[in-house]
Amino acid sequence: MDFNRRTAMAAGLGAVVAASGATASAATPTTVTVTVQGEAAARTNIPVRRDRRASGGRYLGLWTTEKPPARTGWYATYTVHVPRAGVYALTAVATAPVETPHTEAVASYPHLSVNDGPFTEIARSQPHWYESPPAWGDLSVLDLGVIELRGGTDTLTFRVTEPTVVDDTTAYVLTLDRFTLRPLEGHPALRELSVPRHREGEPALLRLALDGHTTHAYRVRYAVSDHHGRQAATGQATIAAGDTSATVTLPDLPPGHYLVRADGVTGRFARLPARPAVTGPTSRFGVNVWASSLVPPSRLADFAAALRDMGAGWVRDGQSWPAAEPEPGGYDTAQHDRRTRTLRAHGLAVLDVLSPAPEWAMTDASLPLPADLRHAYRYARRLAAAAPEALQLSNEPDVDTTSGTGDAHAAFVKAAALGIKDAAPEPCLVVLPGIAQTGPFQDVMLANDVVRYADVWAFHGYPDPTEPGEPSFPGAADEQHELARRHQADVPLWMTECGAFQKARPGEDLTPGQEIAQARYVVRSTVEGLAAGNDRQFWFAGPPLHDDGVYFGLLDRDFRPLPAYSAFAALTSLLGAAHFTGFVPGLPDGVRGFAFDSGRGERVTVVWADRPVRLDRYVTGTAYDMMGRRLPTGRPVTASRDPLYIATPADPPPPPATTRPRARLSPAEHIVLAQRFSARDAAPGKDDGDAPPPHGYRLGRRTRMTVDVYNFGATARRVTVAAQPVGGGWTVRTEQGREETRIRVPAGGRIGVDFTVRAESSVRRRIDRRLAFGAMLDDHSEVPASVALIHLR
């Protein structure tokens, strides 16, 4: 394509800097910064678009659902002239691959090739992109790292080969206004210190990498320290002239988390325990990943391997329903299915989470659920056909921003669960929504008898971020187990989110003290969760994640392990099968002890205390520190804030209990009742779960509503629907004035039954009452009831 050539004189240099649509400016009296316009590509198959906000009034703009050409991908190649060879910082005004504080717009992860070299994905983490300052519109000023140029004429090619989720579709997106090259004085310099994951007994290989080719022997002195800052090793390495890296072998170190420092650069690595953890579906340990949003495609395989090596048996992931089903019955799950296959190929069991429904499926009154629950049935059945190990039916519906109610969500849960259970003779597990906190929303859901449709009860729990000191395990587990007992729920309980709110520093994330506090809490919260009776425990989160000033991940912003990663690995390695057997009696005041059967003929006790306490007279066995390092025998064992493990031989575990058979749902359970009110009668908003009463639908003195009767069975059914007495001055009648009516519902069909709800003059305003409808088949089998809250507005 044609382009204007521009020339510019650097101040005092006399060097001509020319590029395709480029400008040069003097950053300092001795450096030249080159800016290249996005629309000035020498070769591209991406269109140029106009916008007066762009630096040249135009920009390179890719947005398409069309697959890229197999050989080239969607690409743009630029010819750039720089005054000299060297290392350059690369920045761009473009759309980031993740949401930022100023926009929800996202782009595909771009790949970059320099001088026709191999393409490398710019696979930076969510915290890195999240901090990008705004430019204009949905564009940000992005730090794309450093590159080495040969000087004179160089070429840069940006390429997109992977789609991203954009609202209700999957598309290939690249928006590039301009990019800038700034020479770095004093470079090449040390860029990275890295040690691949390895276990005790395997060699620890330290790789020292420069950001460019050195012209002379480059000598580096390095120091290695453990998680307490104690020096563990020192050494030196030489990178030969003409090379960019060198590798040296570190001395033998115990399991743990280590920092390696040299020339102002810090690296991190984990030396894992020699004994791997139990992995796969039988594991009790899980991690939230949300891979589509938080893990660049090129990193996914190594990320999955890192979780497996850490001892996570489960990952909690999800996909966008609007993107997966952009139109009724038109499914596009290929991208998510590839991620799931990658995770499972590394031995991880997958818990998938259903997202809110597509816009085409919702009405103002049904938000965030489909107005027709048959869409939920079909979508869940489609997801179950991909055979994840488990499907969770929503995430924290009790605290989202909608006016959705517990009864509506219960009907949705029933429909989706039926879709899953009808997908295969041995379907994946049905996991109830992850509830953020006990309260009226969950109470109404449970009153609708949703547990009979599920295999797992789920909830979340986080410590109070306003409490001083280190985080403490929340009371959510005890509350949920008590609630499950009250409802006689004969299903296991999973805590599908558990994490800690750690304030993040821009550009640096956690302080060393916060890192250790996070490592302690990973162990303590998991141990206390298992002791409370949780069957599975999922940490939030695995990948680097910076959300509104809070950091959650087990990996830092460069995908390197934090101390919590190593602590997690020690926990899973030492606890093994992690069958909680009881609290340890007779310990000194202030010491907490939890005993586990590892399933390997060991009893493993986990202890900690808020102040140092000697334990020599109270426990015996082989002791390990929080990172899995074996403590010397014969020395005092002291409980502290860092959890300790004491392993002793034990009798072999009893044979596992017989798994409760998963009964197939009856024809009556394939009938789902759903109350439907108009949008003007919608319940008040949930106010992040803290809204005061009333919580029910807001009715007038006379309100018409509908009970939708769904038949998810394969045979037509005759159903008698009846309103149950409300009391307190309320009456409910059909349009014919009766309390019940008999209808025929075809297989896969939906029939609406209209009712009128009346409030007498004695009814007080803003007082919730239960409105319930029951149903019965002709064989007198009872259909699970629909129970809602109503009040007079």
Regions found by a protein language model. Give the residues of each.
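N-terminal substrate-binding region of glycoside hydrolase catalytic domains
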Residues: 275-378, 392, 398
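Aromatic-lined carbohydrate-recognition surfaces of secreted/lumenal glycan-active proteins
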Residues: 416-442, 487-501, 534-545
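Active-site cleft segment of glycoside hydrolase catalytic domains centered on the general acid/base Glu
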Residues: 361-454, 460-479, 505-523, 553-555
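Carbohydrate-binding surface patches
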Residues: 93, 586-621, 626, 717
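Extracytoplasmic
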Residues: 28-189, 734-735, 747-754, 775
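Mature N-terminal, pre-catalytic/accessory segment of carbohydrate-active enzymes
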Residues: 28-38, 74, 81, 160, ...
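Aromatic/acidic polysaccharide-binding cleft in carbohydrate-active enzymes
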Residues: 506-566, 584-586
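C-terminal beta-strand-rich structural cap/linker in extracellular carbohydrate-active enzymes
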Residues: 634-670
